[in-house]
Amino acid sequence: MKTFVENGITHLDLHGVRHHEVDDLVLVFVLRNQDLIPLVIICGNSVKMISLTKSCLDFNAIKYQDIRYGLIRVEKI
């Protein structure tokens, strides 16, 4: 997991993260950086990683948008 800022937007890169870690990492990232929304989560090409990330966001009623395949932008908590 890596976080970085690009073009003024904070990103979470999930490359190398194990599937069972996704829920906690995504939720902590969003809550810690909620004052910096929009945020971007990079899931990569893994269908499973994208699904796990979206499930976490949906469960916690966090609004998001697919920017393109493997990239999710958090819009609102």
Predicted regions and their residues:
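Long, charged, low-complexity intrinsically disordered regions
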Residues: 1-77
